Amino acid sequence: MKILTKWLRAYLPGLSVDDPQLAEDLTLRGIAVEALFFVPTSVGKQKAQWNSVFEMDITTNRVDAMNHYGVAREAAAIYGLSVPDLRFDLPKPEHAASPFHVRIEAEDACGRFTARVLRGISIGESDDWFPGAEVATYFELLEQKKINNAVDATNFAWLAMGQPTHVFDLDKIEGGIVVRRARKGERLKTLDGVERALDAEDLVVADHARPLALAGVMGGWDTMITPATTNVLVEAAWFEPMAVRRTARRHGLHTDASHRFERGANFHAAPVASALVSRILLANGGWIEGELVDVRVAELEARTADRKPVALALSEVRRILGRTEDEEGITGTTVEGVLAALGCGLASQRVSESASQHDSDAAWLVSLPSWRLDLEREIDLIEEVARVYGYNRFANTLPAFGEGVRALPWAESEAAVRRTLLATGFHEAIASTFCSAAEASLTAPQPGLVVPLGNPLSEEAGVLRPSLVPGMLGMIAGNLHRDVSDVRLFELGTVFGGTTEKVEERPAVAFGAAGSVPEQGPLHPARAIDFHDVKGAVEQVLARFQARAVYFDRFPAEAGLTPAWLHPYRAARVAAEGATVGWFGQLHPSEAAARKLKEPVLVGELYLDRLYKLPLRKPMAREISRFQPVRRDFSLVLDESISWENIDQALAGLQIPELVDWRVREVFRDARLGTGEYSLLMGATFQAKDRTLREEDLQSFQAQVVEAVGKAGARLRS
């Protein structure tokens, strides 16, 4: 916004610094002057003059400084000056036959509404009607369009003191004023000429027959001021910020009034602004009929204007702000001077009954000014002390830190997973924590437990991700579509479940691969990546934890247990310690087609919360046996419903120290086997640490192995 320095100096006659210095000092105190430029102006036959204008960048929490008086108040605090209270004397009102009636029905959205009746007003072009304010010059320099003296008076009020006001043609109001919600089917033609269908949540200023204005946003066409207007109703009110924001957004409007009401206006400024507008309108004749009508809602007034005092201790100010370059540092007098200059009231109090009278024991109960809604806590007051005192006056010191850095409970486990996947050829990537509702329903482990966002950025980012898979698929597709043929990615992150009221978080890792495995020498040429490559990476991750029972299994497609994003016949479940810890396999063809992926993509996800509860497996050195190992092969026949994991678990339960290894050598399927059966060649290695195994030892071990696999559902092939 633009601030005219001539107008500022009208409030601060004792200000002696030049405009560039003023701009620098305001900027250092957080009231940023983005640019200082000089504008020539010539009004009438006067000689052209150069006037300086500040281009300000006021943060949204400082609505009190979005006007000339507010910036003058900041300058007064910086230089130790006093700024006069805004008071506008009006002529004594004439007696009204009956007082103007105002009623607030929407007590949750309108805390105060003032109305003043002016009669005999002449509507025309604005003259220099306000003492000390050359209106034509001011408006020209600030690029403010002049309309007529009534509308210009309301614009002058918000430029001067930041309080939006509105003027109605009184003769077009039926009965009194009612501040209420719009009713079904009501319509309102606003000052921009647009006829709007009102929503039941819209806040309106109405008379006894129809809506007259969108409260705090824009006035209505039917009651606007025209050259024929002689009787005027001046409105100055306080509207609840959220109510104004919602109404403005629904109708796609952003006005000077809504900009200020949305950020919180000064509850006590309404009567002052009303007096300012009235004084301007009465400059060319007319009179006031009746006293100012001032209707308030006690609950909103207590919440916004009459807030509880905040306790502030000098010791806390010094602890937070640290050492200054001045030897004396921040004193009680400094704190009192800064806060008083900002409009705060201070009541001194002792820290405790035994507190001494030293300056370090100073403490106050600070009453907050009604125009500073951004001040709520002790830390806010401390920030104000630092800001006005000057950030540049504090010494450069490092903050003290008394506690050690504590890592997350699973930091070591997470690092182990990361190192393992990096070592197996994967690259780490990071995706958004949001996804679409469709992706969430497809990949959520528990489909009903998806957490929607209250204010989503877009439909594609409408829920918290219940799985890392959507982000992983997006990253793989993005690489493949950009001619990156060989992709291996993983992401370590958090997934979300539960409900909006109780969101549950759990760590997870997703991984995806496509393309080929690079050549690893003449005996290992490049080849397409397959299911077993990904399975090997999963095994490496699981091997880092001391999980006793780790196995992989798959379910018939008819069972419907495989996640919808995986190929029903090319996927596996990962289990550890008797619980599911993840899934992996080839991406479902329909999902691949939806993402325009022409080559097979392998993807998976592990839920790490269960694994993180297990201790990490520590590398241990063991003595290598000096005695010869002996391998025995077992040709087994199994039903298709029995997997290798069943055999693996059966052998793991054997109490045979000499059984040091067992693994699949070959899988064979043939019609000559029984229906629904397959053959598996298993190799078992026996080795003792203290002797050479004899034939009778091996026969005993073999018998135990055959018995164990038999209990698991396998039989020796004849």
Would you name each region that the model predicts?
Residues 1-354, 358-410, 415-417:
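RNA/tRNA-interacting regions in translation and RNA-turnover enzymes
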Residues 2, 10, 19-21, 341-343, ...:
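A carboxyl-terminal module marker
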Residues 32-39, 82-84, 283-297, 394, ...:
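Short beta-strand elements
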Residues 140-146, 259-266, 457-461, 513-531, ...:
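Short histidine-centered catalytic/ligand-binding loop motif
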Residues 178-218, 222-225, 393, 398-507, ...:
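Class II aminoacyl-tRNA synthetase-like tRNA-binding/catalytic domains
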Residues 268-284, 475-488, 699-707:
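His/Asp/Glu-rich mid-to-C-terminal helical/loop segments that flank catalytic regions of hydrolases
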Residues 287, 333-349, 362-366, 479-483, ...:
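Long hydrophobic segments that form regular secondary structure
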Residues 299-318, 368-380, 405-414, 441-449, ...:
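Short glycine/threonine-rich loop-to-helix capping motif typified by GTGT followed
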